[in-house]
Swiss-Prot record:
Organism: Hydrochoerus hydrochaeris
Sequence similarity: Belongs to the pancreatic ribonuclease family.
Protein name: Ribonuclease pancreatic
Stretch list, region Disordered: 1-23
Keywords: Disulfide bond, Endonuclease, Hydrolase, Lyase, Nuclease, Secreted
Keyword Transmembrane: no
GO biological process: defense response to Gram-positive bacterium
Any GO MF annotation of the entry: lyase activity
Localization per record: Secreted
Tissue: Pancreas.
Quaternary structure (record): Monomer. Interacts with and forms tight 1:1 complexes with RNH1. Dimerization of two such complexes may occur. Interaction with RNH1 inhibits this protein.
Catalytic residues, chain numbering: H12, H119
SMART domains, alphabetized: RNAse_Pc
């Protein structure tokens, strides 16, 4: 079975990619990364930074998670991300997404012996 850490990488890490010149980025990636198989996942964020940099966030600023848990961490620096949001006229299995890129600080939940990201909690303006 796919581990939580591997699922996080599949759903949220695209180190080599960028949506900068591709309005279809989300439509392509949401299918390629298997997030449209049983439904159209409504919202998803891809992080375009090296995996090691994303994993390092687990040792950065400890912040509360949206669900109240305490194992979330915010990156000190902003990261190049792409937000994918399902469009209102999207009908499964023809999932259609709006692609928005940003530079933001990311918040991830971490767990396990290696203490790696297992959940993408939010993207926020970097705190000064």
């Amino acid at each position: 079975a796919e581990s939580s850490a591997m699922k996080f990488q599949r759903q949220h890490v695209d180190s080599e990619g960028s949506s900068s010149s591709n309005a279809n980025y989300c439509n392509e990636m949401m299918v390629r990364r298997k997030m449209t198989q049983d439904r159209c996942k409504p919202v998803n964020t891809f992080v375009h930074e090296p995996l090691a940099d994303v994993q390092a966030v687990c040792f950065q600023k400890n912040v509360p998670c949206k669900n109240g848990q305490t194992n979330c961490y915010q990156s000190y620096s902003s990261m190049h991300i792409t937000d994918c949001r399902v469009t209102s006229n999207s009908k499964f299995p023809d999932c259609s997404y709006r692609t928005t890129q940003a530079q933001k600080s990311i918040v991830v939940a971490c767990e396990g012996n290696l203490y790696v990201p297992v959940h993408f909690d939010a993207s926020v303006e970097p705190s000064t």
